[in-house]
Amino acid sequence: MSKGHSLQDPYLNTLRKEKVGVSIYLVNGIKLQGTIESFDQFVILLKNTVSQMVYKHAISTVVPVRPIRLPSAAGDDAADAEPGNA
C-alpha cells in the first residue's frame, strides 16, 4: 500500500508546505476551497474560514490554484514512463 502513496504524499506535502490554495471536489460534486493544513492516510485537514476534516475516500479531485513543482525523488519513475508516451 505504501507504493500507492509514493505520489500522493509528496504532492499533498508540497501543497501544505507552500500553502498553495486548493479546490477539492468531492465524489458527490461539492467543491471545497482552502489550504491544506495537515493530512494523514485517511483525512485531509482543509483550512479556510474554519478547518474541515475531509475523508480521502470522499475526494474525487484536488486542484491547486497554481502549478506546483514536486521534488524529483521519483525521477526514475518518470524516465520509465517516458518511452510509453512516445
Swiss-Prot record:
GO terms (BP aspect): regulation of DNA-templated transcription; regulation of RNA stability; regulation of translation, ncRNA-mediated
GO MF, one example: RNA binding
Top-rank lineage group of the source organism: Bacteria
Ranges of residues in domain Sm: 9-68
GO CC aspect terms: cytosol
Protein keywords: RNA-binding, Stress response
Biological role: RNA chaperone that binds small regulatory RNA (sRNAs) and mRNAs to facilitate mRNA translational regulation in response to envelope stress, environmental stress and changes in metabolite concentrations. Also binds with high specificity to tRNAs.
Family in the record: Belongs to the Hfq family.
NCBIfam families: Hfq (TIGR02383), PRK00395.1 (NF001602)
Subunit structure: Homohexamer.
The name this protein goes by in its record: RNA-binding protein Hfq
